[in-house]
From Swiss-Prot:
Active site: S127, K164
UniProt-annotated site: Cleavage, residues: A91, G92
Assigned EC number: 3.4.21.88
Cellular component GO terms, alphabetical: protein-DNA complex
Organism: Leptospira interrogans serogroup Icterohaemorrhagiae serovar Lai (strain 56601)
Family the entry assigns: Belongs to the peptidase S24 family.
Name recorded for this polypeptide: LexA repressor
NCBIfam families membership: lexA (TIGR00498)
Residue stretches in coiled coil: none
Keywords noted in UniProt: Autocatalytic cleavage, DNA damage, DNA repair, DNA replication, DNA-binding, Hydrolase, Repressor, SOS response, Transcription, Transcription regulation
DNA-binding segment(s): 28-47
Keyword Repressor: yes
Function: Represses a number of genes involved in the response to DNA damage (SOS response), including recA and lexA. In the presence of single-stranded DNA, RecA interacts with LexA causing an autocatalytic cleavage which disrupts the DNA-binding part of LexA, leading to derepression of the SOS regulon and eventually DNA repair.
């Protein structure tokens, strides 16, 4: 049996969680809705997972999914939501555009607040090390376009996303690092793309 991609792992974890929760698998449409893809896209993921020996599907039956092998993420909490890991946040594109998404990861439902969208962003650099955010960490972000002073946010400046502490001043926005090597960024053109609510670290 071959290894699954990150997205295939997330799909398999979702199927496993639904079966445990209600006793039967999700439909292809439900899988598509969960991951923001078409029914055909969901079906293609199922067939790829089936080829790797993790499940069986039956033709012409929307719920005919049988698990053969447990998901590699089975040790994670069952009540979990898959969120996209955004490779880049670019101006002019929806943040969840397919071309922005590099993989998916599960997060506990306790992190979620109702239906507020979330995404993850890979941290680059050491500008936030004094608050325990290191290079390579995965920041869990609640999508929003407003922030309060002192919150850690993802801000888009031109075509570059940065994770910084937000302060709104009279005629500008100040974005502060938490590393004395870096000076504050002062700008009138920053766009808030979300607020930090959690952190994943891979050892």
């Amino acid at each position: 049996m071959k290894d699954l991609t990150d997205k295939q792992q997330a799909v398999l974890a979702f199927i496993t969680a639904i079966i445990k929760e209600r006793g039967f698998p999700p439909t292809i449409r439900e899988i598509g809705d969960e991951f923001g893809i078409t029914a055909k896209g969901a079906y293609d993921h199922l067939k790829a997972i089936e080829k790797k020996g993790y499940l069986k599907t039956a033709k012409n039956q929307s719920r005919a999914i049988e698990l053969i092998r447990q998901s590699p993420m089975e040790s994670l909490p069952v009540q979990a939501t898959s969120i996209p890991v955004i490779g880049q946040v670019a101006a002019g594109l929806p943040i969840f555009a397919e071309e922005n998404i590099e993989s998916y990861i599960p997060v506990p439902d306790e992190m979620a607040k109702g239906n507020v969208p979330m995404y993850a962003l890979r941290v680059q650099g050491d500008s936030m090390i004094e608050v325990g955010i290191n290079d390579g960490d995965i920041a869990i972000i609640e999508k929003r376009d407003i922030a309060r002073n002192g919150e850690i946010v993802v801000a888009l400046i031109e075509d570059e996303a940065t994770l910084k502490v937000y302060y709104k001043e009279q005629d500008q926005i100040r974005l502060e690092a938490r590393n004395p090597k870096y000076k504050p960024i002062k700008t009138k053109k920053a766009t808030v793309m979300g607020k930090l609510i959690g952190l994943y670290r891979i050892y």
